Amino acid sequence: MVVVILIGVLAVMAIPAMTTAQIDRRAYNDAILVAELFREARTRAMGRGSAEMILMTSPGSAAGGDRGTFQLWEGQVMAALSILPVGSPMSTCGFPTVWPALAATPGTVLAAGATAQLVDGVNLNGTIESQDQIWTTITGPGGVNMSSGAYMCFTPLGRTYFTAGNGGTNFVSGTPFLGELQISVQRALGGVQVGITRTVVVPNSGATRIVSK
């Protein structure tokens, strides 16, 4: 009987640590999803022969707002009167490819005026993220905070372009992205950041890695 009681006491004592580990694991899983989205974009660009653009926003915080939205768009011919058939790949990040400036609403795969289609995405505004106070911050080259909006585009030839802001894409030909993008996935408790921060490091090759600290 004493042994049973001791086991019960030890199990109860372990609950807080197990709960913390579970929440940290959820944040890590979110970081994996974000990292894989960039790898998917790089792979699709080479495999499909089309430009692939990731639109990202995270102006929110642990308390709420947009905790992190990442959408993968593929450049495609969308108009029937084009020289190429509808659905044909568009291989350039700049003109004549037109990218959406804002994230698509749930259930939407097209954007007005854009020559691109939404093919995948990661939305960190779910019930679990809200409950566990998980959110992301985006840091561009030079340590500049870009949570209000940023865009990264991969071409089939291996070039990567990047632009920041929420006013729309502005990929300039001949000026490929240099440096790295960092997306930190963290969590809070009572509004105070706690636990392990998972940082998704995105170089211009698109070969992401996750740093935990």
Q: PLM features: what roles do these ranges have?
A:
Residues M1, V9-R39, T43, A51, ...:
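N-terminal helix-rich module
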